[in-house]
């Protein structure tokens, strides 16, 4: 009974944290859009929407990818946020209403410079669709843009790759990616009548290591978008 009460208390704590982060994520997204910056909330709040209970995922900081140049993002951040010294290759760190925020110049990096360049090219090619993919947060907390299913299945795998080599992988990342793959399979494959709209894998190879390789099933009605492998 004591353990059950501890778990119930922890669940309520996580719920309150999610309510706070959702409100701030919506505020941040609206602020950036009103200031003329196209953006997309990565991982956290979008991933939570795939959970059976969207308040059950332990939230972290808010990662927002801003579709603008590094110089423009830096100039904007200096005007609108308090910045510390932690400015990295792919993001800078700040906070909004007490919630840690990472403003991303690009979503993720790779250690190999050739693969990194290909990945950034792919990010730029798909940026517009991600910043246009608007969803509603639970209980009317507001709207945010999140990545499509087909973008997530590639992006979050590279994020796991980065964690594996540089930071370590936690259970949250593993569960997140399981739900990402599950969401991708439902939105991109199971919603299609493959007998009428076959996906020809021989014409659309998936490997990321070959220049020009693509895999592009037609978008589903849920807005999952296309899948084009980095090349």
Q: Residue spans of the language-model regions?
A:
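Conserved NTP-donor binding/palm subdomain of two-metal-ion nucleotidyltransferases/polymerases, i.e.
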Residues: 1-60, 65-194, 198, 205, ...
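N-terminal low-complexity, intrinsically disordered patches enriched in charged
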Residues: 53, 220-221
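Glycine-biased, low-complexity coil/linker segments
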Residues: 211-212, 222-225
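Ala/Thr-enriched low-complexity intrinsically disordered regions
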Residues: 214, 228-229
């Amino acid at each position: 009974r004591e353990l059950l009460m501890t778990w119930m208390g922890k669940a309520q704590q996580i719920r309150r944290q999610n309510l706070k982060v959702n409100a701030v994520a919506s505020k941040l997204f609206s602020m950036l859009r009103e200031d003329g910056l196209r953006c997309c909330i990565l991982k956290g709040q979008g991933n939570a929407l795939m959970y059976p209970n969207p308040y059950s995922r332990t939230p972290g900081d808010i990662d927002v990818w801003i579709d603008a140049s590094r110089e423009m993002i830096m100039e904007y951040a200096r005007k609108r946020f308090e910045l510390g010294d932690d400015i990295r290759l792919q993001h800078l760190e700040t906070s909004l209403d007490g919630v840690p925020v990472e403003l991303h110049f690009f979503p993720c990096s790779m250690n190999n410079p050739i693969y990194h360049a290909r990945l950034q090219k792919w990010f730029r090619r798909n940026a517009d669709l991600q910043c246009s993919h608007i969803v509603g947060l639970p209980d009317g907390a507001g709207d945010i843009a999140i990545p499509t299913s087909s973008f997530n299945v590639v992006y979050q795998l590279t994020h796991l790759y980065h964690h594996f080599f540089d930071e370590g992988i936690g259970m949250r990342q593993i569960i997140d990616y399981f739900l990402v793959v599950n969401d991708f399979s439902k939105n991109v494959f199971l919603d299609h009548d493959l007998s009428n709209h076959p996906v020809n894998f021989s014409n659309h190879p998936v490997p990321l290591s070959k220049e020009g390789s693509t895999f592009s099933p037609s978008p589903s009605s849920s807005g999952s978008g296309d899948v084009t492998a980095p090349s």
